Curated annotation (Swiss-Prot):
<comment type="function">
    <text>Catalyzes the folate-dependent formation of 5-methyl-uridine at position 54 (M-5-U54) in all tRNAs.</text>
</comment>
<keyword id="KW-0520">NAD</keyword>
<dbReference type="InterPro" id="IPR002218">
    <property type="entry name" value="MnmG-rel"/>
</dbReference>
<keyword id="KW-0274">FAD</keyword>
<keyword id="KW-0285">Flavoprotein</keyword>
<dbReference type="GO" id="GO:0050660">
    <property type="term" value="F:flavin adenine dinucleotide binding"/>
</dbReference>
<dbReference type="GO" id="GO:0030488">
    <property type="term" value="P:tRNA methylation"/>
</dbReference>
<dbReference type="GO" id="GO:0005829">
    <property type="term" value="C:cytosol"/>
</dbReference>
<keyword id="KW-0819">tRNA processing</keyword>
<dbReference type="GO" id="GO:0047151">
    <property type="term" value="F:tRNA (uracil(54)-C5)-methyltransferase activity, 5,10-methylenetetrahydrofolate-dependent"/>
</dbReference>
<dbReference type="InterPro" id="IPR040131">
    <property type="entry name" value="MnmG_N"/>
</dbReference>
<dbReference type="InterPro" id="IPR004417">
    <property type="entry name" value="TrmFO"/>
</dbReference>
<keyword id="KW-0808">Transferase</keyword>
<dbReference type="InterPro" id="IPR036188">
    <property type="entry name" value="FAD/NAD-bd_sf"/>
</dbReference>
<keyword id="KW-0489">Methyltransferase</keyword>
<dbReference type="GO" id="GO:0002098">
    <property type="term" value="P:tRNA wobble uridine modification"/>
</dbReference>
<feature type="binding site">
    <location>
        <begin position="10"/>
        <end position="15"/>
    </location>
    <ligand>
        <name>FAD</name>
    </ligand>
</feature>
Length: 444
């Protein structure tokens, strides 16, 4: 291979992971990141692998598909997982991180790596004659997005993603909330804001009639179900919220709770959960409350939540457009372009949805870019593993109806033999098989 380095464009979760995996294999990397010279609508810092929505990497149990994926990534030496583990904050059975400490750790490791050259500039064209990993994310700049869309025949794929508000803990009315994790899993890590039926109905009415921030007239709303604005969810009906982000099951009142409740019920009618957002525990985000209501409306409506009557919002929810590719047509399971084998794509732009999934795609793309550099065959993880099932899904889905996908047990290959009826036991068996199958790939 005449090329002496590999380009990685974009230093989000996927690009950071790809750059690390390539450099780890002894290959020089030129890592391009435009933040620092050009801002995006959502990013707040110039740190690599910044988390722009939630600070949660979601469930950590092996009976949870994303928990399995995280364990696979740990075993494959993921820089994202390593930094996340070093900057964990309490989150019950989930893995949440101090977003600033975590991002600084990723940035420092990549900046100090002897084989990684950091180039702070905007890339406006796709290199055609060099091995390149494009991981510019769902917030890809317009100029580069046009080039990527050209690979897609100019098709306009987009959807809207929304970020939840963050409040100052010191302004929360602690007399109206209680500390508890659902079903008491792990340590009590969430502040729970319980609602009576009357409080919930008033809140639902206010939420469904609140004024939303305007969208561009030429853009059609197309939401990904996993990050749907709370006001859109509310308009689908009361049960959508009660079985969604405000479900009360497993969040019974503590014995010493003195706030209002419906009669002698031990469980609230509805619950809004607040999750710690930084290591200091001074900030909490409103779980599942991604929104694009106008800021004044957010304050008015969300201060109806018990405990948040006088809460100070350090960040209001915001809305942005996310773009993704027609991966079933464009990519191989190694995240390699079908049109140009020297190009690899990674991250949410490929149709994987979520922080952990983005890191996983970067790991696979980085490994395969390095293998191409060394003139080795592409690596395809088996779809009995979580890290193999994601690229399998996005490259085998129906192109006409392709939508971003979180990792889940439904996309992992089923177990051989009779179906295990107990769900927990079935997921444990899938996880055990996945980690056993992954073992053969730990030295690649």
């Amino acid at each position: 291979m005449s090329q002496s380095y590999i380009n990685v464009i974009g230093a989000g979760l996927a690009g950071s992971e790809a750059a690390y995996q390539i450099a780890k294999r002894g290959i020089p990397v030129k890592l391009y990141e435009m933040r620092g010279v050009k801002a995006t609508p959502q990013h707040k810092t110039t740190h690599f692998a910044e988390l722009v929505c939630s600070n949660s990497f979601r469930g950590d149990s092996l009976t949870n598909a994303v928990g399995l994926l995280k364990e696979e990534l740990r075993r494959l030496d993921s820089i994202i997982m390593r930094a996340g583990e070093a900057h964990r904050v309490p989150a019950g059975g989930a893995m949440a991180v101090d977003r600033e400490g975590y991002a600084k750790a990723v940035t420092a490791e990549l900046e100090n790596h002897p084989l990684i050259e950091i180039i702070r500039e905007e890339v406006i064209d796709i290199p055609s004659d060099a091995i390149t990993v494009i991981a510019t994310g769902p917030l890809t700049s317009d100029s580069l997005a046009e080039k990527i869309h050209a690979l897609n025949g100019g098709a306009g794929f987009y959807f809207y993603d929304a970020a939840a508000p963050i409040v100052d803990k010191s302004t929360i009315n602690m007399d109206r909330v209680y500390l508890k994790s659902r079903y008491d899993k792990g340590e009590a890590a969430y502040l729970n804001c319980p609602m009576t039926k009357e409080e919930f109905m008033a809140f639902h009415e206010a939420l469904t009639t609140a004024e939303e921030a305007p969208l561009n007239a030429f853009e059609k709303e197309k939401y990904f179900e996993g990050c749907m604005p709370i006001e859109v969810m509310a308009k689908r009906g009361i049960k959508t919220m009660l079985y969604g982000p405000m479900k009360p099951v497993g969040l019974e009142y503590p014995d010493d709770y003195k706030g209002p409740r419906d009669g002698d019920f031990k469980t609230p009618y509805a619950v809004v959960q607040l999750r710690q957002d930084n290591a200091a525990g001074s900030l909490y985000n409103i779980v599942g409350f991604q929104t694009h209501l106008k800021w004044g409306e957010q304050k008015r409506v969300f201060q109806m939540i018990p405990g948040l009557e006088h809460a100070e919002f350090v960040r209001y929810g915001v809305m942005h457009r996310n773009s993704y590719m027609d991966s079933p047509k464009l990519l191989t399971q190694g995240f390699q372009s079908r049109a140009n084998h020297r190009l690899f794509f990674a991250g949410q732009m490929t149709g994987v949805e979520g922080y952990v999934e983005s890191a996983a795609s970067g790991l696979v793309a980085g490994i395969n870019a390095a293998r191409l550099f060394k003139e080795e065959e592409p690596l395809v993880f088996p779809n009995t593993t979580a890290i193999g099932s994601l690229p399998y899904y996005i490259t085998h889905a129906d192109s006409k109806h392709f939508q971003p996908m979180n990792v889940n047990f439904g996309i992992i290959k089923e177990l051989d033999g009779p179906r295990i009826r107990d769900k927990k036991e079935r997921y444990e068996a899938i996880a055990k098989r996945a980690l056993a199958d992954l073992a053969a790939y730990l030295t690649v």
